[in-house]
Design a protein with these regions (language model features):
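Bacterial N-terminal signal peptides
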Residues: 5-14
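Generic hydrophobic-segment detector
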Residues: 4-6, 26, 85, 89, ...
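A cross-family detector of function-defining hotspots
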Residues: 20-23, 37-79, 86, 97-163
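Second-shell loop/turn segments in exported
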Residues: 26-33, 89-96
Length: 166
């Protein structure tokens, strides 16, 4: 029994370490990627060149944030303005993640969460938006069939673009 208990404790401790090492999303960014940083600062943070494809799309473009494609970074007018998270591997500071049920997000963010029907799918698809106290930043969850399918964070206006770059 002692061996089983020790094994279980090691397994749980190992899981906790993995969870603690994963980046978390806030109004201000994910890991080393910060809202408001320049494209050059983003290049340094990512360890690779940041350039739009095709080059004439420099006004607004997306860059993969990591090799696992768990998030992407929107650069508009030379600055990071929004980050789109598509993987459950990156939770918010409150613990919400892709794959969570709408009710779980409501419970985490409470009455401050603004709910709107999804632009394309309508109800039951929703946008659940949580604003910073000064309303400069937002965290927006996009849902499909009662489950978070993606979420965005960053400056309030770009987080509400339904098409990403305009």
């Amino acid at each position: 029994m002692r061996v089983f208990t020790t094994f279980l404790a090691m397994l749980l401790f190992g899981c906790a370490v993995v969870a603690a090492d994963s980046p978390r999303a806030s109004f201000m960014g994910v890991g080393a990627i910060r809202i408001g940083m320049t494209a050059d600062e983003l290049s340094t943070a990512l360890g690779r060149s940041v350039a739009p494809e095709p080059p004439d799309e420099a006004g607004c473009f997306y860059i993969p944030g990591d090799s696992a494609a768990s998030f992407s970074v929107m650069v508009q007018d030379g600055r990071v303005v929004r980050i789109d998270v598509d993987s459950p591997s990156i939770p918010t500071l409150r613990g919400a993640r892709v794959g969570d049920k709408v009710d779980a997000v409501r419970k985490l963010y409470g009455a401050a969460l603004k709910e709107e029907p999804h632009f394309y799918a309508g109800l039951p698809g929703l946008y659940l938006t949580y604003f910073s106290s000064d309303r400069r930043f937002a965290l927006r969850f996009e849902t499909h069939e009662g489950v978070v399918s993606t979420y965005y964070l960053g400056y309030a206006e770009p987080t509400q673009y339904v098409e990403g770059c305009l």
